[in-house]
UniProtKB/Swiss-Prot annotation:
Record annotation: effect of changing residue 589 to S: Loss of disulfide bond
GO cellular component, one term: host cell endoplasmic reticulum membrane
NCBIfam families: bunya_NSm (TIGR04210)
Ubl conjugation among keywords: no
Membership in a protein family: Belongs to the nairovirus envelope glycoprotein family.
Species for this entry: Bovine Schmallenberg virus (isolate Bovine/BH80/Germany/2011)
Annotated transmembrane regions: 210-230, 315-335, 362-382, 449-469, 1362-1382
Protein name as it appears in the record: Envelopment polyprotein
Gene: GP
Cytoplasmic side: 231-314, 383-448, 1383-1403
Glycosylation sites: 40, 493, 686, 1353
Signal sequence annotation: 1-17
Keywords recorded for this protein, A-Z: Disulfide bond, Fusion of virus membrane with host endosomal membrane, Fusion of virus membrane with host membrane, Glycoprotein, Host endoplasmic reticulum, Host Golgi apparatus, Host membrane, Host-virus interaction, Membrane, Signal, Transmembrane, Transmembrane helix, Viral attachment to host cell, Viral penetration into host cytoplasm, Virion, Virus entry into host cell
GO biological process terms held by the UniProt record: fusion of virus membrane with host endosome membrane; symbiont entry into host cell; symbiont-mediated perturbation of host process; virion attachment to host cell
Lumenal side: 18-209, 336-361, 470-1361
Length: 1403
């Protein structure tokens, strides 16, 4: 035993004597490496081994004793995998192309994106479809979008494009180029065979004829299968296919065929007469066959035996296979192979309540009005019938209508018979009573009834319901919470109508009245003004104004479910009291959570709440802070100031003065009453809290602290530099306005700048406004300062980054700007401040973004305000976004020169301007008649109008004709682009965890601290009883005691950028009109019609899906799905968020540690945040969303159609007499240029001369886009576009009777790829992406059209029920119909096989 103790003591001495050397621990990951940072810390940081895009980083920690605690020296090493990375001159960029881990002064690893600044050239080889990058030094590139590839290169690299259409962003150096390019044909087949042994030429030929190869293969395989089937009886299943054709042949044979003289069968010039008749009978001689035919014994052509023979024939089956394959491929081949701010809660609540009240009142009022109106109408009808019965009667003797007044019955008639109320005596004339007889009564009653009805509808209900401290001059002895609480607005019992501000401040001085009126006080801003005031007397005075100005708003808090209750209730639900965590059944918890048990919140069965608080000041303070935060929204204004004072001084018993005044007024608001009763209960808890003195700022403190200033004259004009500066505090005598700070410059008064006062960076005795450069003005004080009391205060200068000089900084960007007429070279540093720079030199340290602000970092530079800088121009060396250049050539010569240029790799799109707005496909033409005001010699203000679907890339050709049918000219209407776009703002980045930042501490004995200290955004971990024998700190001999605790944060690699929609969607349609002599385009908003002197456009829209609210972007692709908003850390994509302020995340860390005797433990963190990055990998890529190449984040949604465009094109006046349909034309000159069989086509410019106005048709050996042109002596230049699918030596063009030939100028290059803008239609060999087969179209556009109205609106469970019923019906049909039918079919096929064998004598 003694020997063991001696050995242990010796080991302990050796452990203390030998320092920990590098390599003893922490030498994992890699050996050697370059030391990049050393951090001294008392917080132990866990060792790391992580990788970024240029290196691997590891850390080694050496611990030592510092006083009574441990400290550590942490060394960070970097092993560069990209050796000469510094040659690319990197700079920090939020949207950079590669990630480097930065190490801050606490040892925390922070991922930062960077961009190289070496010049890089980006080009596109259109012949091969490759992106070409050139850089004279090492550089980093990234291609993202529909394809993704990235890496480092030097000198030159070629990256082939992979997809048929590419919308990509190429980043290389400081350039970022966005473009959209499409191959002429699909590349999926080529991409599949790429890398095989086949040469590229063979791959291209094979993929070009892929459909033909597949068709031939299918026919061959099908033919082999059919030959095999001929050996079985299954082949007779084709009888229904062959039989109709054989039957038709038999009918034609019997009726129309010419007969042979020898055998009486159909003539057979190349064969001998047969011995078998068409009815199947067999004879030995031709004469017997002829006799059989002559005697009419032949029953005719037998179709069924011939059909069975065809089923067994290999030739007929092969023909059937070919036909079936063609039909089958026409079916399956492609047709042509796309959180609310709590301050705003009351306003939101009031708005919702108002809208709901309007809806309710409208509904109730409409119902009451309807019932009331119906009642009035029914009453009037009943009154009318009663009056008619009382005043008149229908006589049964004579059939006429008599008045009841004076009517007498005598035997079989009355004294008024043969007379009717509608006229005089009828005598013996025939008259029968009808409704017309009472016309006078009806009209009279209708007028009277209408008047009565109007009177009944007049509303007659009129609802009217109107139902000691001097807070204006409070004394200095009353500035305690007890007295000040009596000045709270609700306690002043002002319940009458509001008082105007002029009456409230009538007793103030004129200057004070002007000042108060200038504040524009109202009920919405007065609470904020009270809270921002610095003197309690001013706050009390304005609380009094509030009580008079806003009595309804002040007492709204005591009305249950009012707008004023929303804020404190929301906070009460958000912050859980500590007592509710342990005793959730308590009435106060249920009251705050669900408004239950609010009448008994003080109930404390078994004294559980008392036991929880008594003797536990920490628990009491925790819940009191929550209560104070809630009450700040119950009594805003002065009450909020007093509650903050209570919280600061910890004089919680002073809360009774506020709670006691609120309780009597809250009897009608049960939830508020219950909450206040609980406040009274918790204040009775038996706890001892040490209070601090009151810290209210009062006028008496200001008055007694400084000496008076006699000279208070305001400065005459603004000044830049303040000499002999003094700080002055001025206030009104009664404290109506809060004290203001001023500065005295040579005894002249100026306003204290809101941005602070600084010492001049070249003369410390002078003062500057806002920064140390004296670039901002000191404004003179107001004239009313002479009426205030002013005190000289101690001169204080602002201490901020503007007052601290630095030799270097982490520069974000360089530039220049105008500062008071002088041009300054400036730098914006990572702290967001601007500095003057005299040299832009790198600091040559391991910090790659650290730059000197002067030569060799010798001089200190001070920041200045950005407001002093105007006309800022940032250097072009900073990141520059580029787009492909578009050149519109006005004449054919320049266009042909561009086509024949040898530059094949430039990202430039060349257009012949007159033909730019034509589609790539020749449109279908229709004829439209000219409309307008017809006059004797023509049409005035002529126009055409029609509609066209608003589909991107759709075009229509129109031949315009006169009313007599004669053609005038052709125009092409082209929907050039349909744009559905919205702006998005950046939220955060997310990605996989590549490492963990961690810090931990150990205590030898005792428990873990509560709460565990940690940085913002870090999560904590701990383990009790961590000290044991052989597992303890230096000098710690505890067993089963102590604590190991710490905090951690994930290091993530940013891969997904999360954006949120920040604007409403905008839908625009651009429509182009092209004629042979002119072309123009107009853009119309979906919501706003376009009316101009040339064209009128409006769009009838259809319902479309809206763009997603939150999207994720990775490598230029847009993903949608369940994504967290900023600040939300639910277990889905975006649970760990990297944004400008740091990293957001949550989780329960999983950790372990390795013990060392007499040494600090090695903490091993296996998990920190709950990173649900795998959920991001399950997001759905939305191919309809693309990122536009704009300066801000703009997303475009591909839409097939937005509706229908109604257009009206104004064409001016036409004179019939001056217009000729057969004009005499001479072609003076013609030039053509372009390419064969390409979307750009062949552009031709013609110079024509004519002496009349007329129209001419255009003919050519190529296909023409415009069919008819209008010629005019005043117009000589015309442009047409041709499509030449085959190469021709010459192009011929005929205009009217004139013809001309020209040799076209053909492009030297043979581009396989075409550049165009993001929203324009790309023309390739496949268009329909929604339905790629005819079967799909049958389902989507045929069957679904029938069943969609029936089942489309049913819920999931109803559809499931219908599917089950249909399945049961199908099962019954299968069991009782299909199976017996198949058995019957099998027997029928076997019977035909036996008959066939008998007919051919095989049995």
């Amino acid at each position: 035993m003694l020997l063991n103790i001696v050995l242990i003591s010796n080991l302990a001495c050796l452990a203390f004597a030998l320092p920990l050397k590098e390599g003893t621990r922490g030498s994992r990951c890699f050996l050697n490496g370059e030391l990049v940072k050393t951090v001294n810390t008392s917080k132990v940081v866990s060792e790391c081994c992580v990788k970024d895009d240029i290196s691997i980083i590891k850390s080694n920690a050496e611990h030592y004793k510092s006083g009574d605690r441990l400290a550590a020296v942490i060394k960070y090493y970097r092993l560069y995998q990209v050796k000469d990375w510094h040659s690319c001159n990197p700079i920090y960029d939020d949207h950079g192309s590669f990630m480097i881990l930065d190490i801050d002064n606490t040892g925390t690893l922070i991922p930062k994106m960077h961009t190289c600044r070496v010049e890089c050239e980006i080009a596109l080889n259109k012949d091969t479809g490759e992106v070409i990058l050139n850089s004279y030094r090492i550089n980093h590139y990234r291609i993202s979008g529909t394809m993704h590839v990235s890496g480092w290169f030097k000198n030159k690299i070629e990256i082939p494009l992979e997809n048929t259409c590419e919308s990509i962003e190429v980043t290389c150096g400081l350039k970022t180029l966005n473009f959209h390019a499409c191959f002429h044909t699909h590349k999926s087949c080529t991409r599949y065979f790429k890398g095989s042994i086949l040469p590229e030429l063979m791959i291209e030929s094979f993929c070009t004829n892929l459909e033909l190869i597949l068709l031939v293969t299918f026919i061959l395989v099908g033919s082999v299968m059919m030959m095999i089937l001929t050996k079985t009886y299954i082949v007779y299943v084709f009888i229904p296919i062959f039989y109709p054709f054989v039957k038709l042949y038999a009918y034609m044979y019997n009726k129309y065929f010419k007969l042979c003289k020898n055998c009486l069968l159909a003539v057979h010039p190349f064969t001998n007469c047969p011995s078998t008749c068409i009815c199947g009978m067999i004879y030995t001689t031709t004469e017997s066959l002829k006799l059989h035919r002559m005697c009419n014994n032949c029953s005719g052509y037998k179709a069924l035996p011939k059909t069975r023979k065809l089923c067994k024939s290999k030739i007929s089956n092969i023909v059937l296979c070919v036909i079936t394959s063609l039909i089958f491929f026409s079916f399956i081949t492609p047709i042509s192979s796309q959180c609310i701010d709590i301050e705003k809660l009351p306003d939101e609540y009031i708005t919702c309540k108002r809208e709901l009240a309007n809806i309710k009142s409208l509904t109730i009022d409409d119902t009451y009005s309807f019932i009331y109106s119906c009642t009035c109408i029914i009453v009037l009808i009943l009154l009318k019938k009663a009056a008619k019965y009382i005043l008149y009667c229908n006589c049964s003797f004579c059939g006429m209508v008599h008045e009841r007044r004076g009517l007498k019955i005598m035997d079989n008639f009355t004294n008024k018979c043969l007379s009717c109320v509608c006229a005089e005596n009828k005598g013996l004339t025939i008259h029968r009573a009808s409704e017309k007889c009472l016309f006078k009564f009806e009209s009279s009653y209708n007028r009277t009834g209408l008047i009565i009805f109007m009177l009944l509808l007049v509303p007659t209900i009129v609802m009217t319901q109107e139902t000691s401290i001097n807070c204006k001059n409070i004394q200095s002895t009353q500035l305690t919470i007890e007295h000040l609480s009596k000045c709270m607005a609700f306690y002043q019992n002002k319940t009458s109508s509001p008082v105007v501000i002029n009456e409230i401040i009538s007793d103030a001085s004129v200057d004070e009245q002007e000042l108060i009126k200038s504040l524009n006080l109202n009920c919405n801003v007065i609470d904020r003004f009270i809270s921002e005031s610095s003197v309690i007397e001013t706050q009390v005075y304005y609380e009094y104004i509030k009580s008079q100005l806003c009595p309804l708003q002040v007492h709204d808090i005591f009305t249950i479910n009012s707008a004023s209750n929303i804020q404190w209730k929301a906070l009460a639900r958000s912050f859980t009291l500590g007592v509710c965590n342990t005793n959730p059944h308590k009435h106060i918890c249920r009251c705050l959570e669900s408004m239950q048990m609010c009448t008994s919140t003080k109930t404390d069965h078994a004294r559980e709440m008392s036991i929880y608080y008594d003797g536990h000041p920490d628990r009491f303070e925790h819940d009191m802070k929550i209560i104070l935060n809630i009450m700040r929204y119950i009594v805003p204004g002065l009450g909020r100031v007093l509650l903050d004072q209570i919280k600061q001084t910890k004089d919680y018993q002073a809360l009774r003065h506020i709670q006691g005044k609120l309780s009597p007024k809250s009897q009608s608001n049960l939830q508020l009453k219950g909450f206040l009763e609980f406040v009274d209960f918790i204040l009775g808890a038996n706890v001892t809290i040490e209070k601090t003195p009151q810290t209210l700022t009062t006028l008496s403190l200001i008055k007694g602290a400084h000496r008076n200033l006699d000279q208070k004259d305001p400065g005459p004009t603004p000044i830049l530099v303040c000499k002999s500066p003094q700080k002055v505090v001025c206030y009104s005598p009664r404290g109506v306005t809060h004290p203001g700070d001023y500065i005295s410059c040579k005894s002249k008064m100026y306003k204290w700048p809101s941005l602070g006062v600084y010492k001049h960076n070249r003369d410390q005795q002078q003062a500057c406004s806002s920064d140390t450069h004296c670039l901002e003005m000191f404004e003179p004080a107001e004239r009313t300062i002479t009426t205030k009391i002013c005190k000289v205060s101690d001169m204080t200068y602002s201490e901020s980054p503007y007052s601290t000089g630095i030799p270097s900084c982490n520069v974000k960007r360089f530039g220049s700007c105008n500062v008071r007429g002088h041009q300054w070279q400036i730098a914006e540093c990572s702290n967001g401040l601007f500095y003057y720079v005299s040299a832009k030199a790198h600091s040559k340290t391991n910090d790659i973004t650290l730059y000197c602000l002067s030569a060799n970092c010798l001089d200190l530079r001070y920041a200045f305000r950005s407001s002093s800088c105007s006309d800022i121009v940032w250097d072009t060396s900073y990141r520059n976004k580029l787009t492909p250049k578009s050149i519109n050539h006005p004449d054919i010569e320049n266009y042909i020169a561009a086509l024949q240029s040898d530059i094949a790799n430039d990202l430039t799109m060349h257009y012949f301007k007159p033909l730019k707005n034509l589609p790539a496909i020749i449109p279908q033409y229709k004829t439209m008649t000219l409309n307008g005001d017809k006059v004797s010699n023509g049409i005035r203000n002529s126009y055409i109008e029609s509609h066209i679907p608003a589909i991107n890339g759709l075009s229509a050709g129109i031949n315009i004709a006169m009313p007599n049918g004669e053609s005038l000219f052709s125009i092409i209407i082209y929907v050039r682009r349909v744009i559905n776009k919205a702006s998005y703002r950046f939220l955060y980045e997310t990605g996989p965890t590549i490492g963990i930042n961690a810090k931990h501490e150990e205590v030898c004995t005792g428990k873990c601290p509560s709460p565990i200290p940690h940085q913002d955004g870090w999560v904590t971990f701990s383990k009790e009883r961590s000290s044991n024998w052989g597992c303890e700190e230096w000098g710690c001999l505890a067993i089963n005691d102590g604590c190991l605790y710490g905090s951690c944060q994930d290091i993530i690699r940013p891969e997904y950028k999360i954006y949120k929609k920040s604007s409403i969607e905008q839908k625009d349609v651009e429509v182009c009109i092209t004629m042979a002599h002119e072309s123009f385009c107009s853009t119309v908003d979906v919501l706003q019609p376009l009316i101009s002197d040339r064209i009128q456009l409006d769009i009838q829209t259809i319902q479309m899906d809206s763009m997603p609210n939150i999207i994720a972007v990775k490598n230029g692709k847009v993903y949608v799905g369940d994504i967290n908003d900023l600040g939300s850390t639910a277990k889905k994509c975006g649970s760990v968020q990297l944004y400008s302020e740091g990293i957001i995340g949550s989780g329960t860390p999983k950790f372990d540690y390795v013990c060392h005797a007499f040494n600090r433990k090695d903490v091993i963190l296996r998990r920190c945040f709950d990173n649900s990055y795998q959920s991001c990998l399950l997001l759905e890529q939305d191919n309809t969303l693309t990122i536009a190449s704009t300066s801000h984040m703009e997303v475009h949604k591909k839409v097939s159609s937005v509706g229908t465009i109604n257009y009206k094109i104004m064409l001016g006046d036409f004179d019939y007499n001056a217009y000729s349909t057969q004009a005499t034309v001479t072609i003076d000159e013609i030039r053509c240029g372009g390419c064969y069989g390409c979307p750009e086509g062949m552009a031709c410019a013609l110079k024509l001369s004519t002496n009349t106005i007329g129209s001419c048709s255009i003919k050519s050996n190529c296909d023409t886009y415009i069919k008819i042109i209008a010629v005019d002596p005043m117009q000589s230049e015309y442009s047409i576009k041709l499509n030449c699918p085959l190469a021709t030596e010459t192009v011929s063009v005929s205009v009217c009777s004139a013809s001309a030939y020209t040799k076209p100028s053909i492009s030297k290059n043979q581009p396989k790829i075409v550049l165009n803008s993001l929203d324009e239609t790309s023309y390739i060999e496949q268009h329909d992406k929604k339905c790629s087969t005819w079967l799909c179209r049958v389902y989507k556009e045929g069957i679904s059209v029938i069943f969609q109205p029936l089942f489309g609106n049913l819920s999931f469970y109803w559809r499931l029920t219908i599917y089950i019923i249909i399945s049961l019906i199908m099962l019954i049909l299968f069991l009782y119909i299909l199976i017996p039918l198949c058995k019957r079919l099998k027997g029928l096929l076997e019977y035909n096989e036996r008959i066939y064998q008998m007919e051919n004598k095989f049995k």
